[in-house]
Amino acid sequence: MALKRSSSMKTQLVDAIQLEEVEMEEEITTTSNNNNPVEPAQVKEPKCYTVEEAVESIGFGCFHILLFVIMGSANIVEAMEIMLLAVVSPEIRCEWHLEDWQVALVSTMVFFGFMVCGVLCGYIADKYGRWKVVFGGFVWASYFSFLTSFSTSYGWFIFLRCMVGCGVAATSQGFVLKTEFIPAKYRAYLLPLASIFWMMGSILIIVLGMTVVPTMGWRWMIRFSVIPSLVLIGLFMFIPESARFQVSAGNIQGAMSTLKRIAKMNNGVLPEGELREPEVTERGNAVTLISSAFRRTSLLLWYSWFVASFSYYGSVLSSSELLEKNLLCVTDPDLEHQIKHIQEETLCYCIPFNSDDYQTLLISCLGEVALIPLNIILLNIVGRKYSMVILLLLSAFFFMLVNICTTMLGFTILLFLLRSVVSMNFNVVYIYTAEVYPTSVRSIGMGFCTSFSRIGGMIAPFIAQVLMSKSVILALSPFATACIICAIGVFFLPIETRGRALLQDA
């Protein structure tokens, strides 16, 4: 009996030990699971993707062609409003008996409006959306441009053109809107083609000058020039808000609708899963532009934009001035002064453009697109940064060559090449700026840059239209010098954006 009781106690003791071991194993397993809560075999995370991945997955298609045509047409409107100044200058000089500085002030006031509103429009675009700003800019610019044709005095004319400059500042945000929809590998091919539309706008205003001004006057030319803006206002309804902005503003549902619409038009597919990206609360914060991450980039870009505008409008207005005052091959300042004022004693001492002058301006406009293939090759092979360096040095070279005494054909060829390289440089600066800044500050970054560019545009008329009367080489040298200094600065830009995904937040 005692033996049986002893055997039973041993059995109970063994069972107790085994039970304790099992409990310890379960505790170890539980602890292990707590330390490693995600096991691929046990828990599956839902798939998610970003806007960048969605844009790359959808690819290029019909939507981008529509985007290219409509947003490219915005360049037509902008070019017409800016190039209008070169065509109308001889006419208003005659009508209101203006001095050189007064004619130059017209261009300066347009760029002043652009400069003041550029930063404001960039801030609003980052805060409330790109689409609203661009659409409002078209309406604003067309309205005040139309009012310009009814100007009764020089004062009203420059005020209304200043208001037009504010509207054009808003439309420049269209480049940001366009960039944010294009896949990375296509940006270097599509964005340079914006020059085609700029050329079309320049040609259109020159053709209007040739046909309308001699018969109906400059006022009707301005009225006709508003028509493309009105057409574009209707077409712009087909362009959606930027999906990148919608995500940064926390509007995931709106971004999904936009991406689905693009995918449907392109016959593309969205990545598997759901769109997920954190909301950016600090949107449109200008302090980011001068933070340690972007300080050197911003400072160099601001000067690059200044020079891009300074050299571009310098080339446009210099050619206009040389043709209007017949200063080609005139190197003696006294003779220049004599030619300039040869008709000053008459009632109207302006010298309007003739057909040959208009033809020269037309041919020089073609230079803005003739070298687009070279621009695309440079962007894809040497990148954005070194493309700017090369183009700036070429710009300086051709600015000095324009001063060489040659025939009208030789002058036209030099002008053609000069307009090619300065417009190519302007285009590359646009592309680099849109790519280097994150979505949270892309528009205000572009706004600051365009504002600095308009400072260059404000100064250019006083050199190209006022200093030109003193000495041709004295007027052309500042443009060449600025390009050389800028080329050195661009070399030290810290970021190359070729093939780089667009950042969402800083």
Swiss-Prot record:
Entries under InterPro entries matching the protein: MFS, MFS_dom, MFS_sugar_transport-like, MFS_trans_sf
Major subcellular site: membrane
Membrane topology of this protein: Multi-pass membrane protein
Coiled coil: none
PROSITE patterns: MFS
SUPFAM superfamilies, per the entry: MFS general substrate transporter
Entry's transmembrane regions: 57-77, 104-124, 133-153, 190-210, 220-240, 297-317, 362-382, 397-417, 444-464, 472-492
An example Gene Ontology CC term for this record: membrane
GO terms, molecular function: transmembrane transporter activity
Keywords: Membrane, Transmembrane, Transmembrane helix, Transport
Presence of the UniProt keyword Transmembrane helix in the record: yes
Protein family (similarity comment): Belongs to the major facilitator superfamily.
PANTHER family reported in the protein's UniProt record: SVOP LIKE, SYNAPTIC VESICLE GLYCOPROTEIN 2
Name recorded for this polypeptide: Putative transporter SVOPL
Source organism phylogeny: Eukaryota, Metazoa, Chordata, Craniata, Vertebrata
